[in-house]
Amino acid sequence: GLGDVYKRQMPNSEQLLVKYPTSSSREKVMGWVLSQQAWIQKKRQKSLGKEDTNRAFFEKLFSEHEIVLLDVKRKVRVSSVRKESGVFDDEVVLWIKDANISREQFLEVLVKTIKKWALKALQEEFELKLAQMGPFRYPYRKFFLTSAKTRWGSCSSRGHVRIHWNTVFVTKSERDYLYTHEAAHLTEMNHSPRFWQLVEVHCPGYKRARTILHSRTLGFL
């Protein structure tokens, strides 16, 4: 039935892609689409907002050679010396030997450089939050970076915590909420009222930070 239909707005386009069972008539499908106009418009506006945010990020990166990581603005420069590369207090140095590198290759090097630094940087922030919140029901054992498509983080009963590497681009309040959320799972493995009470105790006003975090695009870089 039409419950199996899903809709996906085409990026940078006014088109709408609708997939539906072959047993459904065109008239029935069009009627269903018309009944979903409010939902479609809401999703379209949200998509356009994300595109504007992403566009601003890349314009800043390529025109001013600047990037903000963990709330700190840093200049981005290129070096042909490998040992000079890395993320530092006021700059990001990329090891690039070929001056004619493509934009896509440049971004690949940027991502690789940031990820290498982000593992330790995000782990240190997360473990600082842990120290403020403990003790927990389940022991914390290991920290991982993730590139998941839909989730900012996760925590298992084995004590494995995963945080999306894109977290380096969000604000301190958003990171505090994310760390609190995943750390709270070391005591409450579900999203029960007790879980959210625990989150609120350690991250007052978390709802605003959660809303902003989930309005962002995961994996845009």
Q: What does each model-found stretch correspond to?
A:
Residues D4-Y177, L186-L221:
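Active-site-proximal or metal-binding-adjacent scaffold patches in catalytic folds
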Residues G1:
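Glycine-rich phosphate-binding loop
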Residues E182:
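Walker B catalytic acidic pair
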